[in-house]
Amino acid sequence: MKILVVDDNKGFLDVMGEFLKEHGHKVILAEDGKQAREVLEEEKVDLIISDVFMPNLDGSRFHSYVREFTDSATVPFIFISGYDDEHTRKVVVDSDIDFFVSKTAPVETIVKLIDRIGSNLSQKAVATERH
């Protein structure tokens, strides 16, 4: 899968990017929602993983932009955050996000989620080809 990862924490961004590449994915990195928006003007992706709280264009506003103004409106979207508190969960719920994973969750959690999303995308592609 081609995955866009968006996070203002450069260290996390680099580690996540390398991790996903090791698992066979093509990865595009962006340091905030504004940069990610520019990426989507040029690239089609299969999955977006975005931090919730970032400068310039936060995850919630970036998610809204993706859903309303891009060809990526139906692309699965995972919010990630180092915060796992009530405020963060409210932002996630209010954003009508597909998935949320805490940055403190075991790496296997995100791997399983990405694998499940990839499997669902493959099944949809097969179903579309049949019709």
Residue locations for each model-derived region?
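Two-component/phosphorelay signaling modules centered on CheY-like receiver
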Residues: K10-I28
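Conserved phosphotransfer cores of two-component systems
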Residues: E41-E43, R67-T74, S95
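Active-site beta3 strand of CheY-like receiver
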Residues: E43-I49
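Receiver (REC) domain active-site loop signature in two-component systems and cognate sites
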Residues: M54
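C-terminal output helix
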Residues: H87, A105-I114
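The C-terminal output helix
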Residues: D115-H131
